[in-house]
C-alpha cells in the first residue's frame, strides 16, 4: 500500500496507525524509501478509542489491505465511520462491504490509480458511498441484529 500510495498524485497524507517493530520499520524503509515522501506519516498505535474514532471521522478515506480472516472488526468500524473505503479485492472484504466500497488488487498501479480516481471524485459520489456503508452496517452488523439472530438460534 505504501509503494502504491507513493506512486499516486494525491496531495493528501497517508497516516498509518499501527505498531511496528524497529526491525520491520527499517526493512520497510529499505524496500519503499517512504521517508522521502512527506505525505506518509507513521502515527503509531492509538489505544484511546475516542481519539481513534475522531481520527476515523476526520479521515478522507481508509485503506484495508487484509486478505484473510473473515469479518474484520477494523473494516466494520471503518465502514461505520469513514465515508470512503478502499479495500483489497478479496472475497472476505467484498462479502462485508459489497457495493459500499471501492476495490483494488495487487497489480502494479491498481491502488495508485484508484487513489487518483477518488482524489477527483465529486463529494456527492463520496457521500453515496458513505450512505451505503452506514446502511450496510446497520442492516447487517448491528448489535441488535446479531443478538436477535443468536436469540432465535438458541430458542430454536
Which role does the model predict for each range below?
Residues 54-70, 83-84:
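Acidic donor-binding loop of glycosyltransferase active sites
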Residues 1-13:
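Short hydrophobic signal-anchor/transmembrane segments that target glycosyltransferases
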Residues 123-155:
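A charged, aromatic-enriched C-terminal amphipathic alpha-helix characteristic of glycosyltransferases
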Residues 67, 83, 87-94, 106-108:
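Short glycine-rich donor-binding/catalytic loop of glycosyltransferases
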Residues 53, 73-80, 91-95:
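Short alpha-helical segment that forms part of, or immediately flanks, the ligand-binding pocket
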Residues 101-109, 117-123:
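Conserved acidic donor-binding segment of nucleotide-sugar-dependent glycosyltransferases
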Residues 18, 27-50:
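Nucleotide-activated donor-binding/catalytic signature segment of Leloir-type glycosyltransferases, i.e.
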Residues 47, 51, 66-71, 92:
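Active-site donor-sugar recognition loop in glycosyltransferases
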Amino acid at each position: 500500500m505504501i509503494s502504491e500510495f507513493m506512486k499516486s498524485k494525491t496531495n493528501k497524507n497517508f497516516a498509518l496507525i499501527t505498531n511496528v517493530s524497529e526491525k520491520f520499520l527499517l526493512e520497510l524503509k529499505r524496500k519503499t524509501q517512504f521517508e522521502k515522501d512527506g505525505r506518509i506519516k507513521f502515527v503509531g498505535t492509538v489505544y484511546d478509542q475516542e481519539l481513534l474514532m475522531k481520527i476515523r471521522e476526520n479521515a478522507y478515506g481508509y485503506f484495508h489491505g487484509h486478505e484473510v480472516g473473515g469479518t474484520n472488526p477494523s473494516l466494520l468500524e471503518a465502514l461505520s465511520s469513514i465515508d470512503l473505503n478502499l479495500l483489497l479485492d478479496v472475497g472476505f472484504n467484498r462479502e462485508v462491504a459489497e457495493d459500499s466500497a471501492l476495490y483494488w488488487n495487487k497489480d502494479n498501479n491498481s491502488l495508485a490509480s484508484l487513489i487518483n480516481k477518488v482524489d477527483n471524485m465529486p463529494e456527492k459520489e463520496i457521500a453515496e458511498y458513505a450512505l451505503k456503508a452506514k446502511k450496510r452496517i446497520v442492516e447487517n452488523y448491528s448489535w441488535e441484529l446479531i443478538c436477535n439472530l443468536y436469540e432465535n438460534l438458541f430458542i430454536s
